[in-house]
A protein has these predicted regions:
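Conserved, well-structured core segments that form or line functional sites
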Residues: 2-112, 122-156, 162-209
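Short polybasic linear motifs
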Residues: 116, 120
Length: 209
């Protein structure tokens, strides 16, 4: 049974939410077709004290979404070319989020060409991994139009064909023994203590069933 995750799920300690997001489904409706994939890799960013977090230097115009209610999208641009997708966690006023780094496309995903939902030629992509946050946002056609929006099926674009973006629980529970953890990627600027925190969680492709 499919169940859309609501604010209550995300309004909990960030590391707990992060681990429980593994095995959940990221779902998007693009050009009338629903595309989806199992979340296989994430990173947690938790509070002012986390030197790897955008919020470590306080609230700004760029990161203000992190301080908002749980269950909303925080999307930002990096390296002048990539959008990065995060979901807000914890209570309002406490800046925390989970970054979605990897997705495994599954059965039921619309057959799309070369990772482009708007392509004219279709090929089956079930089982293809999207590794890296830039690949996830490119394939799912995610940009700053969704920044600050609630994670649900409602489209923020009115009558446009692009729909919402949400996360579903489809009853899959990843055993604790299958969840791997490591330091987050590319956060050396946070210093040795915070760069070394094991706040990256992932499952291997063979365990994404």
């Amino acid at each position: 049974m499919k169940r859309i995750l609501r604010e209550k799920f995300f309004n909990r300690p960030t590391l707990i939410v992060a681990k429980e997001l593994l095995g959940k489904y990221l779902v998007r409706k693009v050009n009338g077709r629903e595309i989806c994939g199992m979340i296989t890799e994430i990173e947690a960013y938790d509070g002012f004290h986390d030197k790897a977090s955008h919020a470590s230097r306080g609230k700004t115009e760029r990161n203000k979404i992190m301080f908002g209610p749980a269950g909303h999208w925080y999307i930002y641009f990096t390296y002048g070319m990539h959008w990065i997708l995060n979901i807000i966690t914890r209570e309002e006023g406490y800046p925390a989020a989970v970054l979605i780094r990897g997705v495994l496309l599954k059965e039921g995903t619309a057959p799309l060409h070369a990772g482009r939902p708007d392509a004219a030629v279709d090929v089956p992509l079930a089982g293809r991994p999207l590794t890296g946050p830039a690949r996830v946002t490119k394939y799912f056609k995610i940009d700053n139009k969704l920044n600050g929006e609630k994670a649900n099926k409602a489209s923020p674009f009115g009558k446009l064909r692009a729909g919402g973006l949400w996360i579903e629980d489809r009853g899959i529970k990843i055993p604790r023994s299958k969840i791997k953890r490591s330091p987050r990627i590319g956060v050396h600027y946070a210093g040795p203590v915070w760069a070394g925190k094991l706040h990256r969680f992932y499952i291997k492709q063979k365990d994404a069933y």
